[in-house]
Curated annotation (Swiss-Prot):
Alphabetized UniProt keyword annotations: Cell inner membrane, Cell membrane, Ion channel, Ion transport, Membrane, Metal-binding, Sodium, Transmembrane, Transmembrane helix, Transport
Protein name listed in UniProt: Fluoride-specific ion channel FluC
Chain segments annotated as transmembrane: 4-24, 32-52, 67-87, 100-120
Function according to Swiss-Prot or TrEMBL: Fluoride-specific ion channel. Important for reducing fluoride concentration in the cell, thus reducing its toxicity.
Matches recorded under NCBIfam families: crcB (TIGR00494), PRK14195.1 (NF010791)
GO MF annotations in UniProt: fluoride channel activity; metal ion binding
InterPro entries for this protein: FluC
Gene Ontology BP terms: cellular detoxification of fluoride
Keyword Membrane: yes
Subcellular location: Cell inner membrane
Family under the similarity heading: Belongs to the fluoride channel Fluc/FEX (TC 1.A.43) family.
GO cellular component terms given for this protein: plasma membrane
UniProt keyword ATP-binding, yes or no: no
Length: 125
């Protein structure tokens, strides 16, 4: 339960950071294009790569700190960072075909699922 609470705390911080970033980008660049979402996805993926490698090579931190930062804060900031890490892990393990299939299935499947959800909600409501 303690580990779950750490992930939740980090997630709350990350979600707040996401909101602030998306809001600031919308004010600065307009809302015709999702600049804020793009920014959090790219920045979150960069931060996930930096964090995972830094923790693995340079810094000895507890599992609790890892949970707070990676799935917690960065997961709340952007779930895209977790997806990007999954792709990188598959790729670096030599499973390039699986990594590419995962990218295609995730992107196409998520967009398709969104449209199915829209259709279902519009049909029911």
């Amino acid at each position: 339960m303690y580990h779950l609470m750490l992930v939740c705390l980090g997630g709350a911080i990350g979600a707040g950071m996401r909101h602030l970033t998306v809001t600031a980008a919308g004010r600065a660049l307009g809302t015709a294009f999702p600049w804020g979402t793009l920014a959090v996805n790219v920045a979150g993926s960069f931060a996930m790569g930096l964090l995972v490698e830094a923790l693995a090579r340079k810094f000895s931190v507890s599992n609790e700190i890892r949970l707070l930062l990676a799935p917690g804060m960065l997961g709340g900031f952007t779930t895209f960072s977790a997806f990007s890490l999954d792709v990188a892990v598959l790729w670096e393990r030599g499973a390039q075909s699986a990594a590419l299939a995962y990218v295609l299935a995730s992107v196409a499947g998520s967009i398709l699922a969104l449209f199915v959800g829209l259709w279902l909600a519009r049909s029911i409501l």
